[in-house]
Amino acid sequence: MDFSPSSELGFHFVAFILLTRHRTAFPASGKKRETDYSDGDPLDVHKRLPSSAGEDRAVMLGFAMMGFSVLMFFLLGTTILKPFMLSIQREESTCTAIHTDIMDDWLDCAFTCGVHCHGQGKYPCLQVFVNLSHPGQKALLHYNEEAVQINPKCFYTPKCHQDRNDLLNSALDIKEFFDHKNGTPFSCFYSPASQSEDVILIKKYDQMAIFHCLFWPSLTLLGGALIVGMVRLTQHLSLLCEKYSTVVRDEVGGKVPYIEQHQFKLCIMRRSKGRAEKS
């Protein structure tokens, strides 16, 4: 049986195949377009891509880092920044020790000797009186800002424990040190705006400590925000890529029936031309 394009039967056979392919391909393409654009919202199915487990963990890590940095800002701000702001208000001056004294009444303190062990003890209160050269007044000397906050009556607050002799010997050593410096000027810090007679020997927090208190929490906050931002950017780029791929597939699918229809028309024109030549 002759199925060549020049025969009548071959012509009908080729035409039937092209029409069948055209009808099966075109409704499928139309159905896909109807699914994508039925509600007037193009590509609504691909608005949000499912995130992977790694992306979810990365986002959780970023938010955890940001929360931890906020907690660090709060803790360091209350424990270091606040005393530092009070410390920078103090100006340097020259002090001269007048006399030292250990109070007769020891002060109460608490200590821990284990997980569930707590005890009560007492420690000697050492007082160091100095003379400020700049204001020219008598003042009570403290070791640092923390000693002023814990007990403003004493030079320092030792670590509490049960050995009273050790606590007393430590206080006597400090008393002997200032007794030898009697009449010798040394540097100290006082607050001009405060009416209190409290001066400190050294500053506990310097500029470098404040730098670390602000740098590391800020770096943690920036790192967490960068992780979350990179994950969101990756998801957004994946979404754009998926949308672009879908649009390209739709365009290619719409061109296939048109090409087949054009081939069918060329076949009809050749058949008509062949009949005209025979007649």
UniProtKB/Swiss-Prot annotation:
PTM field: N-glycosylated. The extracellular domain contains disulfide bond essential for the gating mechanism.
GO biological process: action potential; detection of calcium ion; neuronal action potential; potassium ion transport
InterPro entries (UniProt xref): K_chnl_Ca-activ_BK_bsu
Topology within the bilayer: Multi-pass membrane protein
Pfam families from the UniProt entry: CaKB
Record keywords, A-Z: Disulfide bond, Glycoprotein, Ion channel, Ion transport, Membrane, Transmembrane, Transmembrane helix, Transport
Residues exposed to the Extracellular side: 82-207
Tissue-wise expression: Isoform 1, isoform 3 and isoform 4 are widely expressed. Isoform 2 is expressed placenta, pancreas, kidney and heart. Isoform 1 and isoform 3 are highly expressed in pancreas and testis.
Location(s) in or outside the cell: Membrane
Known function: Regulatory subunit of the calcium activated potassium KCNMA1 (maxiK) channel. Modulates the calcium sensitivity and gating kinetics of KCNMA1, thereby contributing to KCNMA1 channel diversity. Alters the functional properties of the current expressed by the KCNMA1 channel. Isoform 2, isoform 3 and isoform 4 partially inactivate the current of KCNBMA. Isoform 4 induces a fast and incomplete inactivation of KCNMA1 channel that is detectable only at large depolarizations. In contrast, isoform 1 does not induce detectable inactivation of KCNMA1.
Taxonomic superkingdom: Eukaryota
Record topology, Cytoplasmic segments: 1-60, 229-279
Organism: Homo sapiens (Human)
Name of the gene this protein is made from: KCNMB3
MF terms in GO: calcium-activated potassium channel activity; potassium channel regulator activity
KW Metal-binding (keyword) present: no
GO cellular component entries: plasma membrane; voltage-gated potassium channel complex
Protein's name in the database: Calcium-activated potassium channel subunit beta-3
Family: Belongs to the KCNMB (TC 8.A.14.1) family. KCNMB3 subfamily.
Membrane-traversing stretches: 61-81, 208-228
Carbohydrate-modified residues: 131
Record remark: domains: Isoform 4 cytoplasmic N-terminal domain participates in the partial inactivation of KCNMA1, possibly by binding to a receptor site.
Self-association state and partner proteins as the record states: Interacts with KCNMA1 tetramer. There are probably 4 molecules of KCMNB3 per KCNMA1 tetramer.
